[in-house]
Amino acid sequence: MGLGASSEQPAGGEGFHLHGVQENSPAQQAGLEPYFDFIITIGHSRLNKENDTLKALLKANVEKPVKLEVFNMKTMKVREVEVVPSNMWGGQGLLGASVRFCSFRRASEHVWHVLDVEPSSPAALAGLCPYTDYIVGSDQILQESEDFFTLIESHEGKPLKLMVYNSESDSCREVTVTPNAAWGGEGSLGCGIGYGYLHRIPTQPSSQHKKPPGATPPGTPATTSQLTAFPLGAPPPWPIPQDSSGPELGSRQSDFMEALPQVPGSFMEGQLLGPGSPSHGAADCGGCLRAMEIPLQPPPPVQRVMDPGFLDVSGMSLLDSSNISVCPSLSSSTVLTSTAVSVSGPEDIGSSSSSHERGGEATWSGSEFEISFPDSPGAQAQADHLPRLTLPDGLTSAASPEEGLSAELLEAQTEEPADTASLDCRAETEGRASQAQATPDPEPGL
């Protein structure tokens, strides 16, 4: 005896309705529920007519297990039940239950909802509970709304047995009430009665189970109060999943670490504990969950792309002709860079090894300043864009890798003050220029 697989509501909508199930009867042992269960099949015979088929098949299977198909109005499902009809169980009938042939729909409509219950009333003395009790049957057949009130009036001052279903306990019980119009209040029962669509028993799913108090529905995130703290260094009560790529906890994606859920306060404890603490060693072995810092990669360095063309030459300084020596024994080196030459104002000549390394040449011939780069692949193209400077006639300076000084000597010359030989040569040059201006040209014809 037991429950089998459930199915949907059968066609026809009629069967034998169980009104009452006796204690320790074969029907109770099989799990049949009063008021909600309808026997629709016994063996392989469909019970869709009001006849003696049910009684005949029960008598034919006395002390033998027989299968019944039962429809439940509360779950709206059909289940299979195995029952053993017997006349040896100590009560009346082979099943120990009272049945009546009717339709499912009409049986679900005949429900009287108990509303407010007055204190010391006949309903309160009988133990009726307000708003949770539903009167579903009695010793007599109740088919209409007025049948219940007629039954109460006919039992004035007499005990009356009622079958009552309680929605909180989800069970039916038998209640004995004695209607009394002189109890001191209104009505014969002293309670409100509701009837109709809004007062029917609510249907329940077949898989519904009572949950313990405080249980969390599936899929609900746990709050802080529901988390259980475990001491550091102790193994957790659940298995820790290990990733095949390594012993790290969490999943690593794009240089970011996904931290596992941590107990509040454990993050600070994990940071305060040093590498030599006992809990730190236990955490390295994978024995406990500890807080992990999320490694953050620094941003890549900013790559700046320089302008490949020539820069503005207005901010750079050019050679001062007054500092150029005309002595044949001294050769001056011109500062040449690959970017620009300035023509702003008079500045001292700085020395560099760039002209020596590149093999550059600077020449003052006549009144033009020319620069050439023989070793450069684009020397001809760059020479057209270089500036030209007009200098006095007779001043010429040439620098070549063979005749020029080394980079170290040139730097030493720029740091040291001009020697006396350079000053003498400079004075001689200025004297010759002044004589040439003072001496007038001979007039033609004299």
Swiss-Prot record:
A GO term from the CC aspect: membrane
GO biological process: establishment of protein localization to plasma membrane; Golgi organization; Golgi ribbon formation; negative regulation of dendrite morphogenesis; protein N-linked glycosylation; protein transport
Residue numbers of Phosphothreonine PTMs: T216, T220, T224
Effect of gene knockout: No visible loss of Golgi stacking in intestinal tissue at postnatal day 10, 21 or 42, in combination with conditional knockout of GORASP2/GRASP55. However, cisternal cross-sectional diameters are reduced and rims of the Golgi cisternae are vacuolated. Abolishes expression of GOLGA2/GM130 in the cisternae.
Role played: Key structural protein of the Golgi apparatus. The membrane cisternae of the Golgi apparatus adhere to each other to form stacks, which are aligned side by side to form the Golgi ribbon. Acting in concert with GORASP2/GRASP55, is required for the formation and maintenance of the Golgi ribbon, and may be dispensable for the formation of stacks. However, other studies suggest that GORASP1 plays an important role in assembly and membrane stacking of the cisternae, and in the reassembly of Golgi stacks after breakdown during mitosis.
GRASP: region residues: 14-214
Cross-referenced InterPro entries: GRASP55_65, GRASP_PDZ, PDZ_sf
Main subcellular location of this protein, as a coarse class: Golgi
One Pfam assignment: GRASP55_65
PTM comment, free text: Phosphorylated by CDC2/B1 and PLK kinases during mitosis. Phosphorylation cycle correlates with the cisternal stacking cycle. Phosphorylation of the homodimer prevents the association of dimers into higher-order oligomers, leading to cisternal unstacking.
Biased amino acid composition, Low complexity: 343-354
Quaternary data: Homodimer. Forms higher-order oligomers under interphase but not mitotic conditions. Dimers of the protein on one membrane might be able to interact with dimers on another and so stack cisternae. Interacts with the C-terminus of GOLGA2/GM130 under both mitotic and non-mitotic conditions. The interaction is critical for the correct targeting of both proteins to the cis-Golgi. Interacts with TMED2 and TMED3.
Lipid tethering residues (N-myristoyl glycine): G2
Ligand binding (Zn(2+)): H17, H19, C102
Region (Disordered): 1-20, 202-252, 343-446
Family listed: Belongs to the GORASP family.
GO molecular function: metal ion binding
Ranges where the record places region Essential for interaction with GOLGA2/GM130: 189-201
Record keywords, A-Z: Golgi apparatus, Lipoprotein, Membrane, Metal-binding, Myristate, Phosphoprotein, Protein transport, Repeat, Transport, Zinc
Gene: Gorasp1
Phosphoserine carried by residues: S365, S367, S376
Protein name: Golgi reassembly-stacking protein 1
Domain PDZ GRASP-type: 14-104, 110-198
Membrane topology note: Peripheral membrane protein
Subcellular location: Golgi apparatus, cis-Golgi network membrane
